[in-house]
């Protein structure tokens, strides 16, 4: 059966897609341009080494690749031959010979993969650059895998190429990319010092930048009016709990779109986000639900009902209390006070079942807003009904 897709171009959500501009990384981009500005004025007189660090999903690879495109244009305007080469070291198990071979094949596609030592292939690379009269930035992504495999000797080989060749044009500069500085501890002091002279550190994204990033991808990847703003906010909040991981946020947006399309939905609803994240992260722990009291379970059932029946991403406690009162009638129970229910909500938030935030004055006053971010409402409702049946036998 074919489904009406809400996607316009889902390739814009692919992990390898490089946007024209990396949002909220202007400072880091300016630093990269400044460190390598010599390439536009005196490219043969110096070589540069920059270490870019940041946790998963902070945009390390994207900002370096975007910089590579920009610097290539700027250097080209000066009539200088230049290439930005990006190699993921982990793809080659940190083997320096294979990494250098990959760089060589940029210029000689059929260069033999075997039969050369590390020193020989490095010299071959330098010779090719000299013959081609070209300058290069070699960006080594996941550089920690090379450090783990090769140690200080590899760092020396790469960073001290021109120490004894001052008269020759210095044609290679480096960008080293890794998550943090910890892998450098295995290197000797001299190698550590060489790598830590120029460091660009990417901080984790907070919620608002993630919203901007998601909205940018929504415009590119989805049809108009198929991704409501509260869905974008929900995904951004979830990604914030995953250490500000933009990659996670974009994947969750894509998965949510897939769940919506599979249901022939006209837009992504919060429930599809909950379904998508429950497929990525185990969310509902039966032991946690079993440990709740009767009225806690009834309040949680009220939350599940609200989000099952409404397409909103957030509710107020007043919304939930109305449904809770109906459930109390169904089970012939006297409703608990507002204060006690608020304490239950706080407990739910503590164990990760719900999230709370203060609502904006412009929308629903300063009341506390409640969301069910990671558990599909229907799944939670079924689980609670099953428990009620077992407990009342």
Please give the residue ranges for each predicted region.
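Conserved C-terminal helix/linker of AAA+ ATPases
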Residues: 259-284
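Short alpha-helical segments that sit at the start of domains
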Residues: 282-314
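A short, basic N-terminal segment
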Residues: 1-47, 70-73
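Walker A/P-loop nucleotide-binding motif
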Residues: 43-68
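Mid-core helix/loop region of P-loop NTP-binding domains shared across ATPases and GTPases
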Residues: 2-9, 14, 44, 64, ...
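Conserved catalytic segments around the Walker B and adjacent sensor/switch elements
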Residues: 50, 74-91
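AAA+ ATPase "lid" subdomain C-terminal helix
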Residues: 240-246, 254-267, 307-310, 328-330, ...
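Terminal-proximal interaction/regulatory segments of ATP-powered molecular machines
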Residues: 307-393
């Amino acid at each position: 059966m074919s489904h009406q897709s809400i996607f316009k171009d889902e390739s814009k959500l692919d992990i390898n897609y490089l946007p024209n501009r990396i949002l909220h990384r202007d400072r880091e981009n300016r630093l990269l341009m400044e460190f390598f500005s010599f390439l536009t004025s005196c490219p043969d007189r110096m070589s540069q080494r920059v270490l870019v660090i940041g946790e998963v999903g902070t945009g390390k690879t994207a900002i370096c690749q975007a910089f590579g495109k920009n610097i290539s244009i700027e250097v080209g305007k000066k009539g200088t031959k230049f290439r930005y080469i990006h190699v993921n070291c982990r793809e080659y198990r940190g083997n320096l010979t294979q990494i250098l071979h990959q760089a060589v094949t940029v210029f000689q596609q059929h260069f033999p993969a075997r039969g050369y030592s590390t020193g020989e292939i490095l010299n071959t690379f330098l010779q090719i650059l000299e013959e081609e009269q070209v300058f290069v930035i070699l960006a080594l992504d996941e550089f920690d895998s090379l450090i783990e495999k090769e140690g200080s000797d590899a760092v020396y080989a790469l960073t001290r190429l021109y120490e004894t060749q001052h008269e020759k044009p210095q044609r290679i500069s480096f960008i080293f990319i890794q998550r943090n500085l910890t892998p450098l501890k295995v290197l000797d002091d001299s190698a550590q010092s060489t790598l830590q002279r120029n460091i660009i550190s990417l901080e984790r994204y907070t919620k608002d930048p993630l919203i901007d990033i998601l909205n940018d991808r929504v415009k590119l990847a989805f049809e108009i009016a198929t991704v409501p703003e509260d869905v974008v906010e929900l995904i951004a909040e979830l990604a914030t709990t995953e250490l500000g991981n933009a990659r996670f946020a974009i994947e969750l947006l894509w998965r949510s779109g897939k769940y919506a399309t599979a249901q022939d939905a006209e837009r992504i609803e919060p429930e599809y986000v909950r379904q998508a994240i429950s497929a990525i992260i185990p969310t509902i722990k039966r032991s946690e639900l079993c440990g709740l009291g009767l009225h806690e379970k009834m309040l949680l059932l009220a939350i599940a009902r609200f989000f099952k029946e409404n397409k909103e991403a957030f509710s107020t406690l007043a919304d939930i209390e109305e449904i809770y009162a109906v459930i109390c009638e169904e089970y012939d129970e006297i409703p608990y006070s507002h204060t006690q229910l608020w304490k239950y909500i706080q407990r739910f938030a503590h164990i990760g079942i719900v999230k709370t935030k203060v609502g904006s004055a412009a929308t629903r006053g300063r009341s506390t807003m409640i969301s069910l971010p990671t558990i599909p409402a229907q799944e939670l409702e079924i689980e609670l009904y099953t428990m009620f049946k077992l407990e009342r036998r």
